[in-house]
Design a protein with these regions (language model features):
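N-terminal helical cap/lid subdomain that shapes the substrate entry/recognition surface
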Residues: 1-58, 65-69, 83, 178
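Asp-based, Mg2+/Mn2+-dependent phosphohydrolase catalytic module
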Residues: 61, 65-68, 77, 81-83, ...
Length: 200
């Protein structure tokens, strides 16, 4: 719902699935709480599936595999209300085995750009922030979050489909280190700059 989206974006927090369903998505239906709890995850999954019409970007599997081959550890940080949506997508794309950590706001209660969600990923990987490069497609969540978490490198991937969401942040002062148009550009960049010792 727009109301929950506004709450989540302003607070940078994610509520538990049961609370999202009860207080926002199905609030007007006055259903028994125990029934809502029982189906909350499924409802959140369907909500995310409808809201996030996922299509795999070109070169994604090849890039993930090549980064793995050259010793780059990988993970994902996602703002999502379902606990099962992202793992299912990663499996569908055949890249789940390469992800050493999958950090979701649904599991942490924290949303990007809150730097704490980035710090959770760093702790799971046992790495320092300066050892990590981050690739994301928004200023509002990814660039700001990576900068606030003081990650070593921030690469923004151009995404025309969501550019309109970032208009309010263009003058925020937060900039990526570089822009790319697709995953096929990523491995050459990492090879070229990895004198910086990026591990992730």
């Amino acid at each position: 719902s727009k109301e929950y989206k506004k709450y989540a974006e302003q607070s940078k927090l994610e509520l538990p699935a049961g609370k999202i369903v009860k207080d926002y998505l199905l609030r007007d239906f006055k259903l028994p709480e125990e029934k809502l709890e029982a189906c909350a995850e499924r409802i959140c999954y369907l909500y995310d599936a409808r809201r996030n019409r996922i299509t795999m970007r070109p070169y994604l599997p090849e890039t993930v595999e090549e980064l793995h081959k050259i010793g780059i550890r990988q993970g994902i940080i996602s703002n999502i209300i379902s606990n099962t949506f992202v793992p299912e997508i990663l499996k569908r794309y055949g890249i789940d085995r390469y992800m050493e950590c999958v950090i979701m706001s649904s599991g942490t209660g924290i949303r990007k750009p809150n730097p704490k969600i980035f710090h959770i990923a760093l702790r799971q990987l046992g790495l320092e922030s300066k050892e990590c490069a981050y690739v994301g497609d928004t200023i509002s969540r990814d660039v700001i979050g990576a900068r606030e978490a003081e990650l070593g490198l921030m690469i923004q991937m151009h995404n025309p489909a969501i550019e309109h969401k970032d208009k309010a942040f263009l003058d925020s002062g937060y900039k990526p280190d570089m822009m790319i148009n697709g995953f096929n550009e990523l491995v050459p960049i990492i090879r070229r700059i990895n004198g910086g010792g990026y591990q992730c």
